[in-house]
């Protein structure tokens, strides 16, 4: 099978190395200015800006059977164009939802999946109104592009709120989330095939430092049958309702056994790296 990956980072490398063992061949789509050291030598690297037309890009990539992603921040128009020539998995629509925290949380709530309370804001007055409704502490995050603690603000008191409100004219739209008093952070790696077969990996307990994942303990300790059933239901609901194809990473808050979804990633995830050595099948092989 010929597989094209949008992105040239470490996750693309791990995907390609896993796929090589299965006889697959890879090519990579590089954004302008994107480094390619991680994937050099693993297959053709095609600069996206050299092929603005999807048909030409498809040919330059070697006419792949499947196009996938190693990151969610990919041009949706590009993926939609490639979808006219190849299977794009996950779907452009699933990736579009996961690119924007507001769309993501709205989609989750529409499926009856619990999240932190939230409001979307675009200016200083709407930010102040949102925090008054949600209470302190609150967390403001960019709707797009924020990850690993970047473009995020902890609002503890009126002073920190006023300071951020004064900056809103120079900031993109934000999502403001009310505090969730969780006991721990969990995550699950889930996968679904084109034929609808699903696989769920064990829950991991994750510890972060300054917003960056430090350790994952797998399987997470002291998971009750009820908690596991909740996690399985969340994962299966998303996979089935979205007709999802590929790997979906689900970050969760555990509040005394009640689970809320924090964020989704429509791709392989660093909390699933353990599966390379400790899993019968790694996340990258799916």
Question: What function would you assign to each model-found segment?
Answer:
Residues 1-99, 103, 110, 125:
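ATP-binding N-terminal substructure of ATP-dependent carboxylate-amine bond-forming enzymes
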Residues 243-273:
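Conserved metal-phosphate-binding beta-hairpin within the catalytic cores
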Residues 223, 275-280:
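Short alpha-helix boundary/capping segments
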Residues 97-187, 191-241:
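Active-site nucleotide/adenylate-binding loops and adjacent lid/helix of ATP-dependent enzymes
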Residues 32, 72, 143, 179, ...:
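Anionic group-transfer/hydrolysis microenvironments
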Residues 211-213, 271-277:
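A short, polar/charged loop-to-alpha-helix boundary motif
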């Amino acid at each position: 099978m010929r597989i094209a990956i949008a992105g040239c980072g470490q996750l693309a490398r791990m995907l390609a190395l896993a796929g090589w063992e299965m006889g697959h061949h890879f090519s990579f789509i590089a954004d302008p200015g994107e480094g390619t050291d991680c994937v050099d030598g693993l297959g053709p690297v095609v600069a996206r800006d050299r092929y603005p037309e999807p048909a030409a890009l498809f040919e330059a990539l070697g006419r792949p059977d499947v196009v996938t992603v190693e990151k969610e921040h990919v041009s949706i128009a590009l993926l939609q164009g490639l979808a006219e020539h190849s299977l794009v998995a996950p779907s452009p629509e699933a990736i579009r939802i996961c690119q924007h925290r507001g769309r993501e949380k709205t989609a989750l709530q529409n499926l009856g999946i619990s999240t932190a309370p939230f409001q979307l804001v675009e200016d200083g007055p709407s930010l102040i109104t949102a925090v008054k409704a949600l209470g302190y502490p609150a967390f403001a995050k960019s709707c797009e592009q924020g990850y690993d603690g970047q473009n995020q603000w902890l609002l503890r008191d009126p002073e920190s709120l006023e300071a951020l409100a004064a900056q809103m004219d120079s900031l993109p739209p934000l999502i403001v989330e009310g505090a969730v008093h969780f006991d721990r952070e969990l995550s699950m790696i889930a996968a679904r095939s084109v034929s609808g077969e699903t696989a769920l990996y064990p829950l991991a307990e994750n510890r972060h430092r300054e917003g960056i994942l430090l350790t994952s303990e797998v399987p997470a300790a002291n998971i009750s049958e009820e908690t596991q059933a909740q996690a399985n239901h969340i994962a299966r609901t998303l996979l089935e309702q979205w007709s999802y194809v590929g790997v979906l990473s689900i970050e969760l808050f555990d509040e005394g056994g009640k689970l809320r979804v924090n964020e989704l990633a429509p791709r392989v995830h660093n909390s699933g790296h353990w599966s390379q050595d400790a899993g019968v099948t790694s996340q990258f092989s799916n």
